C-alpha cells in the first residue's frame, strides 16, 4: 500500500478567491498517492487551462481501497457497531459541513466542470439536502413481522449489502456524490467511489469533511482515475458486492458485463436518454416555451434526462417555434463565474466537437437551423443554444443522445401519434407533457414509457422522489425511499414456537 501522503494544492478561481484542493486518493480517511505515482491532468473547460494534477488510481489502488472497505465492514469493526441513529448523525454532520462550505464547493465545481456558478450553488445545496434526507432515513428502514400461524414467528431484516463500488459522471460531479454515497452509507455499507476522469475535484473536496463528521476509516473511499483501469477494476472486482454506475448506455453495458462475469455483483444503472417533451395545441405556449428551453439548455444540455426531442402539435407548431427561439435568445452564455450566466461551457473539447458534429449532420440531412449552431466566443468550449426544426426521427439528431444544447423539434397531429412517437426510442428515462387538459395530461403520462414524466414543467428533481429509467435508460431507482433498496438485501428469519416435528 502506498504510504506517501498527498495533501493539497491551492487553487485561485477567477473571482480571486483561493481555495484548498485535495489531490490524493482518499483511502482509509487519508489522502495518499497512487501506488505507481500516476497523475491525471485536470483542465477548466471555460478557459482551456490546466487547473492541477490529481492522483491517478489503477487496479492496485482499487485493491487497496477494497481491502480497507472490507475491513471496515467486518462485524467487529467500529462501523458495524454504529447504531443506525449514529450513521444518520454522521450524514447530517456531513450535510452541515457542505452548507458551511457552499461557496468553496460551488466555485471548485464551476472551475472544473464549466457550469454556471448559480447552477453549481444549486447542486451543492441539493447535495447537502440529499445527505440530510438519507441521514433521517438511517434509523427508519427496517423489515416486517409476519404472522403465519400461532406456532411460528417470522420477521424480515434489511441488511447492508457490503462493499459497494460507485462510478459517477462528469455532468453533476458533486451532486452525484450525494446520490450515491448517502443511501449506501445510511444503510450501513462501505463504499469506493470513482470520480469522473474529467471532473474529480469537488468529490475530492468532499473527502476533507469525512473524518471530522465521525465516519471511521475505510467507510468512504474516493478514487480519481479513468474508466478503462479504475472503473473496470471496480466493476469486475471479486470482493465488491455491488456496483452503481451513472453514465452512458454503452459504458453501462460494459459495467453490467463485468459485474456478471466476475462475482455476479448487484448492479444499479442510471444511463442515457433521448427524452420527448410534448406540447399540445391547448398548452400555455409561453410557459411551455420556458420549460422546453430549460429542459434542454439547463446545464449546457449535459443532462441524461434532457428534453432533447420536442414534439409540437401541428396547429401551434410555427408559433411555438417562434416563442422557443425568442426565449432562447434571452439566455446568457459565457463566463460561468458571472452571476447572470445561465449556460456555461461544455465539459471538454471532445464533447464540444461531438455536439458541433451533430448540428452539422442535422442541417446536412434537412433540418432547419432556427437559432445557434456554432461556437460561442473564441476561448472555452461554449456552444450556442441550438434549435433545429423540420427534424425527422431517422436523423441522428432526432434519435441519438447528443448530450449538449441541441433541441430537435418534430411536428405531430394526434394524441395517439404523440404517444407512439414519444415512445419510439430505445431510451425511457424521462418525458414532458404540456397541456391544460388534465385528462389528456394523465392519459399521456400513463402511456409514456419513461421513469419520470413532468406535466407543464421539466427537469425538476428532488431527493424525496425516485429517479431512473425504463428500457435502455437503466436498472433500478435512485433517490427517495426507493433508493434504499439498491443498498440493502432482505433476510427472512423463521422461529419455531412449538411446531410439530415434520418427520
UniProtKB/Swiss-Prot annotation:
One of its GO terms (biological process) is ethanol catabolic process. Keywords: NAD, Oxidoreductase, Phosphoprotein. GO terms for cellular component: cytoplasm; cytosol; Golgi apparatus; mitochondrial matrix; nucleus. Its EC number is 1.2.1.-. The record marks 171 as: Transition state stabilizer. NAD(+) binds at residues 247-252. One of its GO terms (molecular function) is aldehyde dehydrogenase (NAD+) activity. The keyword Ion transport does not apply. It holds the Pfam family Aldedh. It comes from the Eukaryota. The active site is at residues 270, 304. The modification Phosphoserine is found at residues 248, 501. It is an enzyme of class 1 (oxidoreductase). Belongs to the aldehyde dehydrogenase family. This is Putative aldehyde dehydrogenase-like protein C9E9.09c. It comes from Schizosaccharomyces pombe (strain 972 / ATCC 24843) (Fission yeast).
